[in-house]
């Protein structure tokens, strides 16, 4: 059975997801509690104001999500601890994802899936009022804030749907236009991505046609004007198109002209809200980099300093490491000593495999780990610059792509030699900068980068299945991905990096 029928309002969809309730015998769309909760424009505005935080916490804040497992699955980070499915997703050789509802780490996909749909539900509820219900949101001075509220709801709607498409193989497309009295069929990730981009297009159009500034607490630390919201939506659209391919063939088929159009109107600033350790925080960054937890995989270390091994061999590896670099040295990336910290010991358990071992950790954002109140990025301007370069690579405009790369972090922060205007050098440099300069920023970034380059270790799931517990609720057959489960090269990797 590949369909599910909802007879409920948007909020009921989330109630089913969150409670695991198999019964659909609940209140209908005329539910007076819902009508009361969204009867006032101020209530709807308040929900819209919380959407940035709700989405950010789904991709950065949650320890119970897929960010950490994708990080180690991409061999960007490494950790032998069983927490957050990090050990299970980084086994060598790789193993299939256990998608049973009884799996101890099932909460990682369950929380991610439910959380994104919960945020989507809130967006849809706002849009149902301001677009379908013709509710007008008016500020105290009489300013019409309906376009602002609508734009934010469309932005987060697109991001929420988009990350379902980036992470999972399929899901349910539910927007403010969905007739929830009818059957909602499951859709493949490509259709989800397409819908998400259309949502972002609506946000972009609203931002171009209107002028507004969000309240300070909607995105702490950033004055989010209509221009900046529009830039964020453009970058988000480029991200979804660029990062969604599951292999090289898919990547070649991307509409790179469209990616370039979005990126050229994308971020001129870093989207990095200031944390308060109460409503805004990033457990993803914390558990990836706090002392004793995750470390940088030796693949990353070797990329910056080729004298180091790309894989930890055995106990004797400590005795064969080269002297560490602490000043600029030709052929070695300066960021190995500005953004990473050498460690003389490794806390991981030997019996779980030396392949987990590393001698470096990521230290660039250590100020957050000591104060918990600094800005933490999800999307950065340099990420948008790389999207511009990638679009030019595929036009091809090799000189233009090389110019962007040589004016950017590779040279200015890494101290590396400029790249030549060749397709191979440019492609390698984009891949490199996403792994090094954007290390541990946006959740899943390194995984998506490795995935579309066919470089994830053989057997690594290329996407995750709808959680088993949700399949049970939907009366759908359980399935999963990994070695022998799914289609090689489409559902699990048949490539690799070593």
Identify the residue ranges that each predicted region occupies.
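Sec-dependent bacterial lipoprotein signal peptides
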Residues: 1-19
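C-terminal soluble interaction/assembly domains
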Residues: 419-420, 428
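Structured, solvent-exposed acidic/aromatic patches
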Residues: 38-45, 84-383, 394-400, 425, ...
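Active/binding-pocket-proximal capping segment
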Residues: 385, 398-412
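Active-site-proximal region of nucleotide-activated glycan assembly enzymes
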Residues: 389
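Membrane-proximal, proline-rich intrinsically disordered regions
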Residues: 21-77, 416, 455-498
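Bilobed periplasmic-binding protein-like "clamshell/Venus-flytrap" ligand-binding domains
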Residues: 61-65, 434-451
